Amino acid sequence: MSIDINWEAATSGPDGEKLAERIRSFIHDKFQQIALPRFIRSVEVNSFDFGTVSPELQVRDICDPFNDFYEEDEDGEDLSESSVSDEPAPSSQGLSQSTPNGDAGSSNSSSNGDGGGNTNSRVGYFQRRYPSGEYAGDFPQPLMSPINLGESFNPYLFPRAGTPGIPGGTSNLGYYNMPRGGLSGTQTPLASVASVARGGPLSLAEGWPPPARQRERARSSDADVDSPQSRSRPSTSSTRQRTSTDGGTPHDSAEIPESESVITGHLDSALPTRRMREQKPDDFQVLCRLQYSGNMRLSITAQILLDYPMPSFVGLPLKLNITGFTFDGVAVVAYIRKRIHVCFLSPEDADTLLGADDKMASTEGYHDHHNHHHSGNTNTTGSRRSNDSLLREIRVESEIGRKESGKQVLKNVGKVEKFVLEQVRRIFEEEFVYPSFWTFLV
């Protein structure tokens, strides 16, 4: 079943301009968090344009939502049923960032970023989740301004929906990101539960067992304690459990080495407790194939440093017009009690869940006759590889400095073009491809 989208009505007018500006601001903020190479001083995202070509949507399956969408926040800030009621919320927007121990820091602003206070918008937040306590390192800086897409969508995007953009009402954005842990092939969380794809709610994170089972396995595992995968995969060692006859604990502490007890205690304190929402019969999830090949455009300006006659002698502006986006992937849209969860599946996970589809094979690389640098995959087999990207092709048109006699002063900008294209692809895959997913309150 295909879905028709009135692309012009959805992306034009004041609402379309606001949405385009918020997307531009979001991508710009992500570029500010990237470590730039030595030959680039700065990167600025100037504009974003939806273009005139609409994507194609085809519903592939309707099933129960993934179990991951039922998980509540560890820090207790998850909105309850009463908090997502129809009562208007304060106009200020909050921004919070959780820590591995569940602590959160927040900062509030008195306006919604565009100068006008929206008294009907709910609090938007940015959050990262780290399953099984595998987090190590510093958190990235939070976004400068949370994106409230609910104000920008309009009913033309999904004509049959009763609300702007998605069913329900004014929506606001929450972001969840869960690292993949380097799994691929049959080790991916989705592949491990593909056998029960039609038997009930799925969890793309079933590769991590519940904390209770992990604690039991940690006590009985002697070989996998120091392995990075020991916290995320089941232990293969046997479980030895003694039954106490004098009313004591089932385990004899004398038989547990002191070093193992210390490690076990560390694992117990590091593993978060997954609190799940109650599943209801009216919860549902839609898997749809999304194809796009149009004239969407992203304009970026990069400052290139010249090292002659001395290091960092001068900076030249390089204008990059990124266009030629070609996208083909499977989108997941789950509706769970006034929440819309949206993400994309990696090509490998999509083939595991829906089966390999010859129609979804990668298209051949675009043959550009204007010497434009482009990025595309050339895999033409029916089953896509795990390293295939959902963004099949991206092209960039570069313009540096001033022009003389219709020719550019400098043309050797291949390194900058390659870097920018790689970052655009990485931002998309890290922010929209599972295990990352976006939550809209409706």
Curated annotation (Swiss-Prot):
Disordered: annotated span: 67-125, 202-277, 364-387
The name this protein goes by in its record: Mitochondrial distribution and morphology protein 12
Protein's UniProt keywords contain Membrane: yes
Domain of life: Eukaryota
Biased composition (Low complexity): 101-112, 227-245
Subcellular location: Mitochondrion outer membrane; Endoplasmic reticulum membrane
Record's keyword terms, sorted: Endoplasmic reticulum, Lipid transport, Lipid-binding, Membrane, Mitochondrion, Mitochondrion outer membrane, Transport
Domain remark text: The SMP-LTD domain is a barrel-like domain that can bind various types of glycerophospholipids in its interior and mediate their transfer between two adjacent bilayers.
Disulfides per UniProt: none
Any one GO biological process: protein insertion into mitochondrial outer membrane
Transmembrane segment boundaries: none
UniProt KW rRNA-binding keyword: no
Described function: Component of the ERMES/MDM complex, which serves as a molecular tether to connect the endoplasmic reticulum (ER) and mitochondria. Components of this complex are involved in the control of mitochondrial shape and protein biogenesis, and function in nonvesicular lipid trafficking between the ER and mitochondria. MDM12 is required for the interaction of the ER-resident membrane protein MMM1 and the outer mitochondrial membrane-resident beta-barrel protein MDM10.
Biased composition (Acidic residues): 69-80
Family classification: Belongs to the MDM12 family.
UniProt xrefs under HAMAP family: Mdm12
Basic and acidic residues biased stretches: 213-222
An annotated Gene Ontology molecular function: lipid binding
Matches recorded under PANTHER family: MITOCHONDRIAL DISTRIBUTION AND MORPHOLOGY PROTEIN 12 (PTHR28204:SF1)
Subunit structure: Component of the ER-mitochondria encounter structure (ERMES) or MDM complex, composed of MMM1, MDM10, MDM12 and MDM34. A MMM1 homodimer associates with one molecule of MDM12 on each side in a pairwise head-to-tail manner, and the SMP-LTD domains of MMM1 and MDM12 generate a continuous hydrophobic tunnel for phospholipid trafficking.
Residue ranges of every copy of the SMP-LTD domain listed in the record: 1-442
Start-end of Polar residues biased regions: 90-100
